[in-house]
């Protein structure tokens, strides 16, 4: 894999300065035109970005030719196959070679690109990522990390896992804490992230056995891994300023994520109905327009689009399948930021640290038992 040294990051053909992002142009609900539009939007804001884009060559050449910001900054890899949202991960593992998703990950595996971005099928993308990139040594279960709007200065919190695996034992939760803290530090500049473990209450006697075990394990690595452990947190803390990283299993995290998305949609619909009921309410909406736009920007799901697959030998960012150009651009921006920070090598170091720490703890317990 590429070194964390920015001077040795993969470069696009013909360019000595750009960080390369591998992009799957197919698989999203809106088609390759939206993905290319998102690439152009991101390229206009980030002069140092270059792309290897995967999909039908003739179609991509036509779409890219219309975007001046992409001139000379793309290398197209022809891939006729497409992984659809209906494809099962098991089928993709057997027959996925030749698809744009497979080709996208292959560019990262071969060291041609630093990170991959795809709007495609989440289950298939995770399965192919584990097959082609492999798990980091010491990682039992990779995790998907998402961003949650919050009261923190950065505007959001990191939560993982949100659906990679419905199970997680104490060691998995410790690994998630280390990976989540590394992600928050390298992706968003938080020098010492605050990590919390999601539970049904903050009292130490509450929760399943694996949560209680993780509650004991996580503080043992916090100092060396440069994060603060705040203990158990509840659902109400997800958008709070008490914590920066929320650790949970994939089942709980996915339910929380989908509940949050549904609630945000409901609030938006109710506000729209309330401000449209009468002439006076429409006038009130006009007076509050500035504040409403600031609120909309703060909680706009497009702005925080991009779930990061953590625990693999490569950085993979999963964009929402229904993302528009702005959402795709946000996912690419996130991948670019992580690539620039040398995130992958730092993450590998943190995971290795967790394995060593767990070994020391287990060794101490065995000595005490004997």
Curated annotation (Swiss-Prot):
It is found in: Cytoplasm. Disulfide bonds: none annotated. SUPFAM superfamilies: Isocitrate/Isopropylmalate dehydrogenase-like. GO terms for cellular component: cytoplasm. It comes from the Bacteria. Gene3D superfamilies: Isopropylmalate Dehydrogenase. InterPro entries: FA_synthesis, Phospholipid_synth_PlsX-like. Keywords: Cytoplasm, Lipid biosynthesis, Lipid metabolism, Phospholipid biosynthesis, Phospholipid metabolism, Transferase. Homodimer. Probably interacts with PlsY. GO terms for molecular function: phosphate:acyl-[acyl carrier protein] acyltransferase activity. It catalyses: a fatty acyl-[ACP] + phosphate = an acyl phosphate + holo-[ACP]. This is Phosphate acyltransferase. Its EC number is 2.3.1.274. Pathway: Lipid metabolism; phospholipid metabolism. The lineage of its organism: Bacteria, Pseudomonadati, Pseudomonadota, Alphaproteobacteria, Rhodobacterales. Catalyzes the reversible formation of acyl-phosphate (acyl-PO(4)) from acyl-[acyl-carrier-protein] (acyl-ACP). This enzyme utilizes acyl-ACP as fatty acyl donor, but not acyl-CoA. The keyword tRNA processing does not apply. The keyword Transmembrane helix does not apply. Belongs to the PlsX family. Its main location: cytoplasm. GO terms for biological process: fatty acid biosynthetic process; phospholipid biosynthetic process. It is an enzyme of class 2 (transferase). It comes from Paracoccus denitrificans (strain Pd 1222).
